[in-house]
């Protein structure tokens, strides 16, 4: 018999995370590596587990993640978004608690583009009076 698996795609900044939830002991694997060796900060790991804390399902699922693009923070938040969507697929009754926690909303903030005549998006060249 085929194993039950729930999928979710999460995005944040330039990161895209494809998440698979499989019933298990709570192991999280990111790009073939354990989450603790992949992400350098404990705060990012807590960020990822937030969806499980809200739905009280910590330790019920193994998480398999393939994530690309962006930096550590963007990737961690993309994973969190993907886990939230996969949990919603697993049990639609989680929608209320996940929505209240703001975990189903895609954060729209992106890097502002560089403008011509400026050094960065808003940083202007140094002004010289003389």
Swiss-Prot record:
Q: Which UniProt keywords are given for this protein, alphabetically ordered?
A: Ribonucleoprotein, Ribosomal protein
Compositionally biased spans, kind Basic residues: 111-130
Q: Does the keyword Transport apply?
A: no
One BP term from GO? translation
Q: Name one GO molecular function term.
A: RNA binding
Q: Which residues cross the membrane?
A: none
The record's section on InterPro entries has:
Ribosomal_Su5_D2-typ_SF, Ribosomal_uS9, Ribosomal_uS9_bac/plastid, Ribosomal_uS9_CS, Ribsml_uS5_D2-typ_fold_subgr
Pfam entry (one): Ribosomal_S9
Segment Disordered: which positions? 98-130
- Domain of life (superkingdom): Bacteria
A GO CC term attached to the entry: cytosolic small ribosomal subunit
Range of residues in the leader sequence: none
Q: Which family does it belong to?
A: Belongs to the universal ribosomal protein uS9 family.
What is the protein name for this chain?
Small ribosomal subunit protein uS9
Protein species of origin:
Staphylococcus saprophyticus subsp. saprophyticus (strain ATCC 15305 / DSM 20229 / NCIMB 8711 / NCTC 7292 / S-41)
Q: Source gene?
A: rpsI
């Amino acid at each position: 018999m085929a194993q039950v698996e729930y999928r979710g795609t999460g995005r944040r900044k330039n990161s895209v995370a494809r998440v698979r939830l499989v019933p298990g002991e709570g192991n999280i694997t990111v790009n073939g590596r354990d989450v603790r060796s992949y992400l350098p900060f404990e705060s990012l790991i807590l960020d990822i587990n937030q969806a499980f804390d809200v739905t009280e399902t910590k330790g019920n699922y193994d998480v398999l993640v393939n994530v690309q693009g962006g930096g550590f923070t963007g990737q961690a938040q993309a994973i969190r978004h993907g886990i939230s969507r996969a949990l919603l697929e697993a049990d639609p009754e989680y929608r209320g608690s996940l929505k209240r926690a703001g975990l189903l909303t895609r954060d729209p903030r992106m890097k502002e583009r560089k403008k011509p005549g400026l050094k960065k998006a808003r940083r202007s060249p140094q002004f010289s009076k003389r």
